[in-house]
């Protein structure tokens, strides 16, 4: 299937996959990664994307394996006037397992004198598979439709189900509601509700939270 000229970076391989998509029927699967910088890369045409000028860039990413959150980068690799390879950040986004998140910068200036340009997507420090969809370059200032950003809490505290940074009776009430409902809509609440870290949220977690609050 057509990967739209995207290629694997480093040890990574790429292929189209119908497992998930942001738009259409398929997305680009990036797999076989052995380091965080192993990702997907695509050459930029210097006639379409002129060094020294501004452009809008966007790409949507998602993943299913690994940690609850992951940090993704959209970057530009290029050769400068001295012949040295440089790496410049276009956009950063923190993603959540099973969700789509958008890497976007409406006004990115391609460094003047850049040659052999490639845009690429990588992670901060993980090696799990991930997916890319709707990677687009456009006129500067263009707001490219996409998944948008995800509001990720700075810290996740076991038992802090309402994510306000404090464990109190409101969290116990939320835990009881979650137990009655069979779970939580918020993935972060679901994560911290598993107080005993059994990988399953159940009555034992509610009891442990209740006991903690009674101390």
Annotate the PLM regions.
Residues 1, 28, 38-73, 103-110, ...:
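Extra-cytoplasmic beta-strand recognition segments
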Residues 1-29:
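Extracellular glycan-recognition surfaces and repeat-rich motifs
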Residues 51-52, 97, 112, 197:
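Surface-exposed loops/turns
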Residues 58, 118-122, 210:
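Extracellular recognition modules
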Residues 73-79:
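Short, surface-exposed beta-strand/strand-loop-strand elements in extracellular ectodomains
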Residues 82-114:
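Extracellular carbohydrate recognition and processing domains
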Residues 122-140:
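Extracellular carbohydrate recognition
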């Amino acid at each position: 299937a057509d990967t739209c000229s995207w290629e694997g970076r480093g040890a990574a391989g790429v292929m189209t996959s119908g497992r998930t998509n942001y738009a259409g029927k398929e997305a680009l699967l990036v797999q076989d990664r052995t380091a965080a910088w192993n990702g997907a890369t695509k050459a930029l045409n210097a006639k379409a994307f002129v060094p020294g000028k501004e452009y809008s860039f966007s790409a949507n990413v998602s993943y299913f394996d690994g940690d609850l959150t992951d940090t993704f980068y959209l970057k530009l690799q290029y050769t400068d006037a001295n012949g040295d390879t440089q790496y410049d950040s276009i956009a950063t986004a923190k993603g959540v397992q099973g969700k789509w998140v958008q890497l976007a910068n409406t006004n990115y200036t391609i460094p003047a004198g850049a040659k052999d340009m490639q845009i690429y997507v990588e992670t901060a420090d993980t090696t799990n598979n991930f997916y890319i969809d709707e990677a687009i370059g456009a006129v500067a200032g263009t707001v490219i439709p996409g998944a948008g950003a995800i509001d990720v809490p700075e810290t996740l505290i076991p038992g802090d189900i309402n994510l306000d940074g404090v464990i109190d009776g409101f969290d116990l009430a939320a835990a009881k509601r979650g137990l009655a409902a069979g779970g939580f809509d918020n993935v972060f609440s679901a994560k911290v509700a598993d107080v005993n870290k059994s990988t399953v949220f159940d009555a034992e977690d509610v009891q442990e939270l209740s006991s903690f609050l009674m101390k």
